[in-house]
């Protein structure tokens, strides 16, 4: 029973049920079991002996409407174009924070609609597909917004700051927090929240765990699960 609860989606906030919610379920069922025993009606066996540490809590995720709300607060300025690329890279392509920050122009394979992640976890590289929306946003940013931010400077990195330098990973995180606030999204979590969200949405859409594993760059299927 608790295996079911630990994997049940949170209908209101996305992700899984919180530890406190699971604990409340456990306490209520324990009290009900004691009532049955006091009335000599038997015992309810639902795995009440399971410890909190044994209950797997799913990561929090954004809903699809949350993602669209993020897009809606972005304008057509150079920084707005960069915002769309931020969302496309971390949600649309499911990259880790360090992977997205390390992307360079040479890592965008336009003819194949792929990103080359050369600095993945544990030094592993991989190719990640870009859907049409992400490819269009990246192309527009590279041809327009990025050039405006750069001025006469030369930088190899994809993400450029408003001063024309390489945008720091902390700045990417801070900007995502600002976008969430503008969109009225209260969910906590940084850029990894977008990675969890796309993985969950792919699963809900019928994508196999094996494909999602390769998409995310996980070494084992257990990590994806």
Q: Over which residues does each language-model region extend?
A:
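Conserved catalytic core of the tyrosine transesterase superfamily
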Residues: 1-225
């Amino acid at each position: 029973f608790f295996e079911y609860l630990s994997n049940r989606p949170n209908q209101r906030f996305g992700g899984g049920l919180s530890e406190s919610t699971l604990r409340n379920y456990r306490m209520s069922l324990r009290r009900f079991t004691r009532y049955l025993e006091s009335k000599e009606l038997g015992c309810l066996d639902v795995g009440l002996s399971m410890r909190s540490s044994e209950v797997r809590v799913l990561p929090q995720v954004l809903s699809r409407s949350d993602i669209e709300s993020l897009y809606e607060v972005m304008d057509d300025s150079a920084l707005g174009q960069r915002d769309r690329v931020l969302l496309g890279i971390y949600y649309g392509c499911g990259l880790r924070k360090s992977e997205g920050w390390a992307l360079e122009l040479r890592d965008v394979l336009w003819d194949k609609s792929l990103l080359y992640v050369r600095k993945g976890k544990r030094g592993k590289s991989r190719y990640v597909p870009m859907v049409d929306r992400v490819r269009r946003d990246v192309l527009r940013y590279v041809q327009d917004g990025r050039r405006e931010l750069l001025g006469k400077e030369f930088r190899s990195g994809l993400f450029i700051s408003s001063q024309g330098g390489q945008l720091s990973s902390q700045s990417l995180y801070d900007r995502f927090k600002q976008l969430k606030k503008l969109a009225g999204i209260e969910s906590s979590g940084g850029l990894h929240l977008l990675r969890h969200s796309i993985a969950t949405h792919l699963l809900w859409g019928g994508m196999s765990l094996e494909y999602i594993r390769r998409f995310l760059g996980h070494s084992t299927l257990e990590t994806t699960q």
